[in-house]
């Protein structure tokens, strides 16, 4: 689970169904989703339109696709952008398409049971 707060106070993020790994192509499953927590709580589930769930490269990570990322962050988690994506049918999650990050939280759970 990745949660981002931008400089305008918007809080949003995404759930990754798989462990992040550097890859040249998209990975993940329909269990992935994007969400907004502030200013409005809303969840954006997989539409079934494509399988562009997660992308991880040395320079960035991204959620969703189909023309543009629903959520994209640079490798340092300092800047990002959010656009409508076909994968999750989300609007831009931040107040501006390109945003600066004030804080990031990441939670992960390993299959320990």
Predicted region positions:
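Phosphate-recognition beta-domain surfaces
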Residues: 1-113
